[in-house]
């Protein structure tokens, strides 16, 4: 699919259905975990198990939550320069409610994507006013603004490990009317238990990372004024 001998081009973003099915064929073990987690939500399980669906959107009262498969091109030999398929990314963006805040949920960070993939993905995120990306993978916290446009919050290791890694979790809040919020990080400090990380921000309250998004109406007005 990708690489020197692959056909994939981020500008068109097409991944052939046969390849999507092949890429998803080896996930039986993962699907069994999903079936247990979402035992009361069979429709969610079907989204994960669909042989042709790479990404999908779950709409709640206030949010569009996009489950973005960032591991489709991952191998032991290819752990960076990943792709998500910009055509299926466009398809799932087109399903969102423009008046709700959209959140991308992935395993890998935006930084792990191929440079061409990053460029096209950023253009699509701008077009659809997507300004929040939540990722895992890193066994530490990483909170930042990407490309002077969207916020990416990366965290997600609850297993105690030795060495430089930390068992930590990010907890946030978001005001759906003001379109702003904040994040705090809690890390496991044995034997004292969960402790707030006191130094995750340069704001006056160093233990809280604050952020603000542009709401859809403001963005629409800016575009209209340019046109």
Listing of model-derived features with the role each one plays in the protein:
Residues 1-79, 124:
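Extended active-site neighborhood of metal-dependent phosphoesterases/phosphodiesterases
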Residues 2, 69, 156, 187-189:
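Residues at the C-termini of beta-strands that transition into short coil/loop
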Residues 2-6, 108-109, 138-139, 189-192:
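Short beta-alpha junction loops
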Residues 27-34, 82-86, 118, 165:
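A structural signal for well-ordered alpha-helical scaffolds and beta->alpha junctions
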Residues 52-152:
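His/acidic metal-ligating clusters that form di-metal
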Residues 74-76, 161-162, 190-193:
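A short local loop/turn or secondary-structure capping micro-motif enriched for an aromatic residue
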Residues 174-227:
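A short C-terminal boundary segment appended to hydrolase-like catalytic domains
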